[in-house]
C-alpha cells in the first residue's frame, strides 16, 4: 500500500512540474483595448493563442515602444510576434517576445 501511495505522489509531482515551454507565432496587443480582457486595470500586454487571449507576464506593454502610437502601438493595432513561454494559471509567462511584423 505504501508503494502505491508513493508512486501516486511521484507521478502526480512529475506531471505537475512538467510545464514545457512553448513557441508560437501569435497575435500580441493590449489585453483591454484590443482583446477585450478586463481582469486587470490599465493597459497590459496580452497574446492570443488559438483564439484565446492571455495576459503576458515577463514583458511590459511599453517595452516595444509607445503603446498608444497610432501606427504601431499595442493599444491601437494587433501585431504578430514569435513568443516563447509557459501557459500557467490563465496567464502566459513569457521568456521571449520577438515582433515579426513589418510595422515601423
Mark where each language-model region is.
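Positively charged n-region of N-terminal signal peptides that target proteins for export
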Residues: 1-4
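C-terminal motif of bacterial Sec signal peptides marking the signal peptidase cleavage site
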Residues: 14-15
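Structural detector for short beta-strands of small beta-barrel domains
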Residues: 21-43
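A short, sequence-level motif marking secondary-structure junctions
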Residues: 29-32, 57-64, 99-101
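OB-fold (S1/OB) nucleic-acid-binding surfaces
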Residues: 40-60
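Short nucleic-acid-contacting surface segments enriched for D/E, G, S/T with interspersed K/R
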Residues: 65-82
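OB-fold/S1-family single-stranded nucleic acid-binding modules
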Residues: 88-104
Amino acid at each position: 500500500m505504501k508503494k502505491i501511495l508513493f508512486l501516486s505522489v511521484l507521478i502526480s509531482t512529475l506531471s505537475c512540474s512538467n510545464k514545457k515551454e512553448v513557441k508560437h507565432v501569435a497575435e500580441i496587443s493590449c489585453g483591454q483595448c484590443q482583446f477585450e480582457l478586463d481582469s486587470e486595470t490599465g493597459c497590459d500586454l496580452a497574446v492570443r493563442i488559438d483564439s484565446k487571449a492571455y495576459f503576458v507576464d515577463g514583458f511590459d506593454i511599453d517595452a516595444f515602444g509607445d503603446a498608444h502610437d497610432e501606427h504601431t502601438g499595442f493599444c491601437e493595432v494587433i501585431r504578430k510576434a514569435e513568443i516563447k513561454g509557459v501557459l500557467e494559471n490563465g496567464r502566459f509567462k513569457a521568456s521571449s517576445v520577438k515582433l515579426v511584423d513589418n510595422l515601423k
